[in-house]
Regions:
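N-terminal alpha/beta PP-like core and its mobile active-site loop of ThDP/TPP-dependent enzymes
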Residues: 1-338, 375, 454-457
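Phosphate/pyrophosphate-binding active-site segments
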Residues: 2-3, 140, 166, 179, ...
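Active-site diphosphate/adenylate-binding microenvironment
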Residues: 8-20, 26-29, 34-39, 345-426, ...
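Active-site phosphate/pyrophosphate- and oxyanion-stabilizing loops and adjacent acidic/basic residues
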Residues: 36, 60, 128, 230, ...
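Conserved thiamine diphosphate
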Residues: 65, 116-159, 340-354, 471-513
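Thiamine diphosphate
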Residues: 99, 109-120, 328, 388-552
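Hydrophobic "anchor" residues on beta-strands that sit immediately upstream
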Residues: 213, 378, 430-431
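Active-site flanking residues adjacent to catalytic metal/cofactor-binding acidic residues
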Residues: 283, 307, 381, 434-435, ...
Length: 552
């Protein structure tokens, strides 16, 4: 045990209990003394980032791989820069703890006009700004620190959403009592009456269903239930698919797996398998505009049984107080009795384009990339042509597919990949980002080189903001960006870059380069030249829907 043991040490021990081995962030004068404890910690490694926004993205990527992450910023200027990333974690149910180093309590109580404040002697403005984007918050004091740390962390882990701790510089040094046991979160027991009512309603529905299908999405992953879903579809012969954020839940080789459902933009076999079913089991789904090609999904309440983290629905009736795991177990048992074989061959590729020769297009790029993916990869695709082009990729077992289509903050992927590679240093990380998106967060490539990471980064260069061009103003200069020499970027961001770079514009050349980088021996950056106006089918459908809604 570290002596003298203090609040800073208690917080670090609790981060370890939650599964974090690293702390991301940017130093500032209000968190420097806490950082001394981080550096001295045998369990937590400090990971400095280029800026607070990137640090928040990196923490998010880390948490999507490890289940939890922590982020450290300084009061005011630092925490506000990170709020965009924290908001994305909140929207997409990612538990990231935001620790803010703050001025000492005495200075706060005196209302001193300190730097990094609004100059009004008030120190709670930014705390209140964080309330809508975190599930639990606390201002730590000498008296409440240990209790509040545990309360915020357990709430985060239960709800799978971010939390916020304001840590005044002097409070971090105050004496604390070490925890006597590890921090654990026991799932709330199901309401037995509600669970029984749900079982009866679901049984009534499934017993008369001639065709049943399963549609899963990202909340299954957030609540650690991928294995339960995989077992379900192995034991019950039914058609199944995911939505974009849930890609990777199912193995592409599993009989009955159709691919990715995205409303009217779905491949025809996927659309028919899901929308043509009498009953669709929607597990952890969120039918957002970007996931459904502008709300074009054709699924009615009467047709669906829906399972969310803490409640479930049959038809129009909601049953509360039922944890997702117990709802899944209930439905799995019922399906074994009532679901008839509705499987289809699992070899539907999702790709309708036959050739991979000549100049690269969106179609030939994704078909070429498909042959490159292998089990165990971590794939991150940025909002735009990257994420929506990846919708038809068929993922083998144990692939983590990370996208952010609900929050949709471009640039997220590059920094999130830094966090993902930090969490999983021995796995192959593949980054798919547009040129416009990469310009927002490219500094973190320097951190990757510093830490000797070896991601494979594909920059899809279509000379600007292609999504915005598709929505409105295709030739307007506000959709243009500065044109960078991408293959020289690693040289600028490291004094001794261990990196290889290529620029490709032909499908054959891309295939050759991918073969060279397959073993990811060093950081690889591949600039992929694509036609300016070429966009994937889902993105085309989505942008038309978005433009129509914007003009309504």
């Amino acid at each position: 045990m570290r002596t003298p043991y203090c609040v800073a040490d208690y917080l670090l021990d609790r981060l370890t209990d939650c599964g974090a081995d690293h702390l991301f962030g940017v130093p500032g004068d209000y968190n420097l003394q806490f950082l001394d404890h981080v550096i001295d910690s045998p369990d937590i490694c400090w990971v400095g980032c280029a800026n607070e926004l990137n640090a928040s993205y990196a923490a998010d990527g880390y948490a999507r791989c490890k289940g939890f992450a922590a982020l450290l910023t300084t009061f005011g200027v630092g925490e506000l820069s990170a709020m965009n990333g924290v908001a994305g974690s909140f929207a997409e149910h990612v538990p990231v703890l935001h620790i803010v180093g703050a001025p000492g309590m005495a200075a706060q109580q005196r209302g001193e006009l300190l730097h990094h404040t609004l100059g009004d002697g008030e120190f709670r403005h930014f705390y209140h700004m964080s309330e809508p984007i975190t599930v639990a918050q606390a201002v730590l004091t000498e008296q409440n620190a240990c209790y509040e740390i545990d309360r915020v962390l357990t709430t985060m882990l239960r709800e799978r959403r971010p939390g916020y701790l304001m840590l005044p510089a002097d409070v971090a040094k105050k004496a604390a009592t070490p925890p006597v046991s590890a921090l654990t979160v026991n799932p709330a027991p199901a309401d037995s009456a509600c669970l029984q009512a749900f079982r009866e309603a679901a049984e009534k529905r499934l017993s008369t269903s001639k065709r049943t299908a399963l549609l899963a999405d990202f909340l299954v992953l957030r609540h650690g239930l991928r294995a339960a879903l995989q077992t379900w579809v192995k034991e019950v012969p039914m058609a199944h698919a995911t939505m974009l954020m849930g890609k990777g839940i199912f193995d592409k080789r599993q009989s009955g797996f159709y691919g990715t459902y995205s409303g009217s933009a779905s491949a025809a076999p996927v659309k028919e398998a899901i929308e043509g079913a009498d009953t669709v089991l929607c597990i952890g789904t969120r039918f957002t505009d970007t996931l459904t090609a502008g709300f074009t999904h054709q699924l009615t309440p009467d047709q669906t049984i829906e399972v969310q983290p803490h409640s479930s629905r049959v038809g129009d009736v909601w049953f509360t107080g039922i944890p997702m795991r117990e709802a899944i177990e209930t439905l799995t048992a019922l399906c074994k009795t009532y679901v008839r074989d509705t499987r289809a061959p699992s070899d539907h590729s999702g790709f309708s384009f036959p050739t991979i020769e000549g100049a690269l297009t969106q179609e030939s790029f994704w078909r070429t990339l498909q042959t490159f993916i292998r089990p165990g990869d971590i794939i991150l695709a940025d909002q735009g042509t990257s994420a929506f082009g990846a919708i038809d990729l068929r993922l083998p077992a144990d692939v983590n597919f990370i996208v952010q289509p609900l929050w949709g903050s471009i640039g997220y992927t590059l920094a999130a990949a830094f966090g993902a590679q930090t969490a999983c240093p021995n796995r192959r990380v593949i980054v798919l980002t547009g040129d416009g998106a990469a310009q927002l967060t490219i500094q973190e490539l320097g951190s990757m080189l510093r830490d000797k990471q070896r991601p494979i980064i594909l920059v899809l260069n279509n000379e600007g903001y292609t999504v915005e061009r598709a929505i409105h103003g295709p030739e307007q200069r506000y959709n243009d960006i500065a044109l960078w020499n991408w293959t020289q970027i690693p040289q600028a961001l490291s004094l001794a870059p261990q990196a290889e770079c290529w620029r490709v514009s032909e499908a054959e050349a891309l295939a050759e380069v991918l073969d060279k980088v397959a073993h990811h021996e060093r950081l690889s950056l591949i600039e992929v030249k694509l036609p300016k106006a070429d966009i994937p089918p889902l993105l085309s459908a989505l942008t038309k829907a978005l433009e129509a809604r914007n003009n309504a």
